[in-house]
Amino acid sequence: FGIGKLQDNYFQSSVINFEEDRSDRSLYRLIGGSISFYGSTLNSRQYATKGYNEKLIAQIFTGKERYKPGNPAEQPVTQERQSWLQISYMKEAYHSMAPKFVLGWMAEALYSSRNFSENFTATMMQAAEFSPTPHSKLMYNEAFRANQFLAAGIKPMFIFNDMFHLRGEFYGFMPIFPIEKNTQNKAFYGKAFSKVEYMGEVSVICQLP
């Protein structure tokens, strides 16, 4: 259980005059709670090569959004209170296929009944994200955000020794209902299962004892 306040500052256009333009702001005041179940035998919290990890999380939230445009000529908007449920499940596992070769896989599914925010940009910033790699967790990418999605991937690895391994990670991401925007920059749901996005990463990992 928790009480929180979130604030997103953003521009709704890719053409920005930083001397004159002011960012829009969406402020959320929320109350929520969650219950989760975890199980893990991974040999490392990051870049694991053995074991499995599984988690099921259910969350419920209620709150209000206040939108303040960057343009002072426009009036702020406060949305009615909304409540929503979010459920997610993820599992990853690693299997030794040969003395030097490991094959990992992962699958993730998420469902959220959250309504749209005041505009498309605010909606996407608050949508659930698929970020299976450390690098993807640092990046904002609208292509891998949705209120409901399915995702899966494989992780082939070549083990050099106890410290070094070559790791590939390749994922597919499918929003159940992709979030689109209209000409007024408002969000709406597109056709079900109409988009698939892909993500790949290859890296050499050094894990110190």
Language model features by range: what are they?
Residues Q7-Q12, G63-K68, I176-E180:
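Short acidic/His/Gly/Ser-rich catalytic and metal-binding motifs that mark active-site loops
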Residues F1-E20:
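Transmembrane beta-barrel wall of Gram-negative outer-membrane proteins
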Residues I3, I60, G172:
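Short, small-residue-rich loop/turn micro-motifs
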Residues M124-E129, L166-P178, N185:
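Active/binding-pocket-proximal capping segment
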Residues D21-S26, L30-N161, G168:
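C-terminal outer-membrane beta-barrel translocator/porin domains of Gram-negative envelope proteins
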Residues N182-A192:
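Short, surface-exposed loop/helix-turn segments at secondary-structure junctions
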Residues K155, I159-H165, E169, F173, ...:
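Hydrophobic alpha-helix feature that most strongly marks membrane-spanning transmembrane helices
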Residues K191-P209:
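Predominantly the C-terminal beta-signal and adjacent terminal strand-loop region
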